[in-house]
């Protein structure tokens, strides 16, 4: 007899794996739009790649980097989604029991629609109604916190791989030894590029760097802006640890923990919508799962999307001046406006809605099959 926790782990891992493969190209576009200023080039903007809409961005990346560019970071993405969802669903189900959620509600596929749908909403005095919603929300938040804390290093590596642009020429050494002006890419169509003059103390450090086309600089300065180009997932892990230390793997953890509010909204709403639809139509259907996942994802993303922008910028390759989430929030507000907190949101919806549907549908199907 397979333990329920193991079933949840297997089903969650399968769900994460399926969703990562389906939406990898859209995730690359979304991450690059969010990272915006993390993209840089040297040599007077020769390598500047301006991204517009979702489809045009995919064409641009494909033209400049090939099919590999659209699937850049898919290795750590798969490596991240599999344990993330495995950990999440295991902790989620355990927490629901811990918080006293009725046995009828202890798993996604066993919800009693007569207690959760319209009838539960109308009977707001019912203690079971409050226990259900409170248990669901706290369980979702705790499971999210456990998942992001344990897997944050993987997402840092994934973000670094995705946000480093790979024109077919130019190496890391060339970029380190090149001109003294770094040109950040502005990913808005028709918007001019923004140039940033590097500080004097940094220029002095750059002039002392010795390099050759075949090796990395001797005693390079540390920090995400100076990290070498990464050849693959394991190379990224090694170089980040070597040049930046263990703490770099937890860059952006605070915004990620704030993002647990996302699942705190999404999961209770998903279970509510799914049960409501089953109750309304008098039968269970995979279509109800997809629709419930879509509606809950839209609601949760609209409320919590800014944290994803903050997390991506903190984790990105070239964000040396933003080591604090508070400072980054202030800087974005002052220099770019509040709209930048929702940069790439349209692309995010195109990516996350199918991903959410695939994740929940895969989980429900695999979990039912394991039973």
Curated annotation (Swiss-Prot):
Gene3D superfamilies associated with the record: Mitochondrial carrier domain (1.50.40.10)
Entry keyword Acetylation: no
Keyword field: Membrane, Mitochondrion, Mitochondrion inner membrane, Repeat, Transmembrane, Transmembrane helix, Transport
Solcar repeat ranges, renumbered to this chain: 3-98, 131-276, 284-369
InterPro entries hit by this protein: Mitochondrial_sb/sol_carrier, Mt_carrier_dom_sf, SLC25A32-like
Disulfide bond positions: none
Compartments, record wording: Mitochondrion inner membrane
Top-rank taxon: Eukaryota
Residues annotated as transmembrane: 9-29, 73-93, 137-157, 253-273, 290-310, 341-362
GO CC term (a single one): endoplasmic reticulum
Family: Belongs to the mitochondrial carrier (TC 2.A.29) family.
Biological process, per Gene Ontology: mitochondrial NAD transmembrane transport; NAD transmembrane transport
GO MF term (any one): NAD transmembrane transporter activity
Keyword Metal-binding assigned: no
Protein name: Uncharacterized mitochondrial carrier C227.03c
Species whose genome carries this gene: Schizosaccharomyces pombe (strain 972 / ATCC 24843) (Fission yeast)
């Amino acid at each position: 007899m397979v333990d329920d926790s193991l079933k949840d782990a297997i089903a969650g891992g399968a769900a994460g794996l399926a969703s990562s493969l389906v939406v990898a190209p859209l995730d690359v576009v979304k991450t690059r739009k969010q990272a915006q200023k993390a993209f840089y080039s040297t040599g007077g903007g020769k390598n500047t790649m301006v991204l517009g809409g979702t489809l045009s961005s995919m064409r641009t990346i494909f033209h400049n980097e090939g099919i590999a560019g659209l699937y850049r970071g898919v290795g750590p993405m798969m490596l991240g989604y599999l344990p993330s969802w495995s950990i999440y669903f295991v902790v989620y189900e355990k927490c629901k029991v811990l918080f006293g959620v009725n046995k009828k509600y202890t798993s996604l596929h066993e919800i009693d629609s007569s207690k959760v749908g319209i009838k539960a909403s109308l009977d707001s005095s019912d203690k079971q109604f409050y226990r259900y919603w409170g248990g669901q929300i706290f369980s979702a938040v705790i499971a999210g916190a456990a998942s992001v804390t344990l897997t944050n290093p993987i997402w840092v590596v994934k973000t670094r791989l995705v946000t480093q642009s790979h024109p077919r020429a130019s190496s890391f050494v060339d970029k380190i030894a090149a001109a003294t002006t770094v040109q950040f890419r502005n990913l808005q169509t028709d918007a001019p590029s923004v140039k940033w003059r590097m500080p004097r103390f940094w220029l002095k450090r750059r002039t002392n760097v010795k390099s050759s086309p075949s090796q990395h600089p001797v005693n390079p300065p540390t920090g995400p802006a100076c990290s070498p180009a990464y050849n693959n997932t394991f190379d990224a892990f090694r170089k980040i640890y070597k040049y930046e230390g263990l703490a770099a793997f937890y860059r952006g953890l605070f915004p990620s923990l704030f993002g647990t509010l996302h699942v705190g909204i999404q999961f209770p709403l998903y279970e509510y919508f799914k049960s409501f639809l089953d109750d309304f139509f008098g039968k269970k259907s995979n279509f109800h799962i997809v629709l419930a996942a879509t509606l809950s994802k839209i609601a949760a993303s609209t409320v919590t999307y800014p944290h994803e922008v903050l997390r991506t910028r903190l984790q990105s390759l070239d964000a040396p001046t933003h080591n604090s989430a508070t400072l980054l929030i202030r800087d974005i507000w002052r220099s770019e406006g509040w709209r930048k907190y929702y940069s790439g949101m349209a692309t995010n919806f195109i990516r996350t809605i199918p991903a959410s549907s695939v994740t929940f549908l895969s989980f429900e199907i695999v979990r039912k099959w394991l039973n």
